[in-house]
Amino acid sequence: MNGTEGPAFYVPMSNATGVVRSPYEYPQYYLVAPWAYGLLAAYMFFLIITGFPVNFLTLYVTIEHKKLRTPLNYILLNLAIADLFMVFGGFTTTMYTSLHGYFVFGRLGCNLEGFFATLGGEMGLWSLVVLAIERWMVVCKPVSNFRFGENHAIMGVAFTWVMACSCAVPPLVGWSRYIPEGMQCSCGVDYYTRTPGVNNESFVIYMFIVHFFIPLIVIFFCYGRLVCTVKEAAAQQQESETTQRAEREVTRMVIIMVIAFLICWLPYAGVAWYIFTHQGSEFGPVFMTLPAFFAKTSAVYNPCIYICMNKQFRHCMITTLCCGKNPFEEEEGASTTASKTEASSVSSSSVSPA
């Protein structure tokens, strides 16, 4: 067996030499060199100093600028809140524990860190799903005479919380569990063991079907239909350069959004599934740590893609940061005017990442 299982932990290293110790009580420097833990702490610090400002700024400018408080932007605020959950509930804890080389907060701290990190990650994931559905409903109009309003937006936000809790809460009440993962400095769902009484197998299968494959299918379907609708509208107005430019912009945005989702979740899901289906096989602590980096980094690049690329949000952010004046206002205004001159069903603003 490649790993050593103990009470509420699994260390991916054989204990033949007798060096394996509980990750709740002893530094894990026998897994990787101490400098690697320092590097992990530095990376977490980078995510904190970049993830907190951009997500907090999103909330702040929305409060400050009334024109941003529209139903279609509710889900973006929810995404920012989800990222802040990851920053405060996951990144800060992992940075501190990495500096010590083990999970110093014990079993209770592992449950709390695992819960908040999972809750934030799942809220972010389902926010992207709801965002895709909302854009599909608004642009493709699968339901005739449908008008997206505040009640729909609130239901979408509530749905993300329900789905996130349906993933983050069960390990706290006996369906699977949270244990230190990778380099043993952060906690996540137990993919490693088949410990009797915690039903890891059924929970992992549930996770992959409900919280990975279904979101993946929904996002591909919604954005696929959206691109087809935009291309059809652009084909009807081939003589309009503005329409063609809008079509290219929408296609580019959709590709970026889908790739970002895959970069965030595919490595983590793939490695977790491999570990689950190959229990006892050879894999090191870095094998699980690196994919988790991709998922954690989403707290930084998701706001950049879904919020900062939106012209209205970007303008308000720059205005706020520059004390009420946007030095790029003429350029932004010219771009907005050009887009408004086109009386077309192709609207990059309604399908843009924000």
UniProtKB/Swiss-Prot annotation:
Keywords: Cell projection, Chromophore, Disulfide bond, G-protein coupled receptor, Glycoprotein, Membrane, Phosphoprotein, Photoreceptor protein, Receptor, Retinal protein, Sensory transduction, Transducer, Transmembrane, Transmembrane helix, Vision. InterPro entries: GPCR_opsins (IPR050125), GPCR_Rhodpsn (IPR000276), GPCR_Rhodpsn_7TM (IPR017452), Opsin (IPR001760), Retinal_BS (IPR027430), Rhodopsin (IPR000732), Rhodopsin_N (IPR019477). GO terms for cellular component: membrane; photoreceptor disc membrane; photoreceptor outer segment; plasma membrane. Residues 1-36, 97-110, 174-202, 275-286 are extracellular. GO terms for molecular function: 11-cis retinal binding; G protein-coupled photoreceptor activity; photoreceptor activity; retinal binding. Residues 334-354 have a biased composition (Low complexity). The record marks 113 as: Plays an important role in the conformation switch to the active conformation. CDD domains: 7tmA_MWS_opsin (cd15080). Disulfide bonds join 110-187. PROSITE patterns: G_PROTEIN_RECEP_F1_1, G_PROTEIN_RECEP_F1_2, OPSIN. Residues 62-73, 134-152, 225-252, 309-354 are cytoplasmic. The keyword ATP-binding does not apply. Its main location: membrane. Glycans are attached at residues 2, 15, 200. The modification N6-(retinylidene)lysine is found at residue 296. The chain crosses the membrane at residues 37-61, 74-96, 111-133, 153-173, 203-224, 253-274, 287-308. GO terms for biological process: absorption of visible light; cellular response to light stimulus; detection of light stimulus; G protein-coupled opsin signaling pathway; G protein-coupled receptor signaling pathway; phototransduction; visual perception. It is found in: Membrane; Cell projection, Cilium, Photoreceptor outer segment. Phosphorylated on some or all of the serine and threonine residues present in the C-terminal region. A motif ('Ionic lock' involved in activated form stabilization) lies at residues 134-136. Gene3D superfamilies: Rhodopsin 7-helix transmembrane proteins (1.20.1070.10). Photoreceptor required for image-forming vision at low light intensity. While most salt water fish species use retinal as chromophore, most freshwater fish use 3-dehydroretinal, or a mixture of retinal and 3-dehydroretinal. Light-induced isomerization of 11-cis to all-trans retinal triggers a conformational change that activates signaling via G-proteins. Subsequent receptor phosphorylation mediates displacement of the bound G-protein alpha subunit by arrestin and terminates signaling. PANTHER family: OPSIN (PTHR24240). This is Rhodopsin. It comes from Danio rerio.
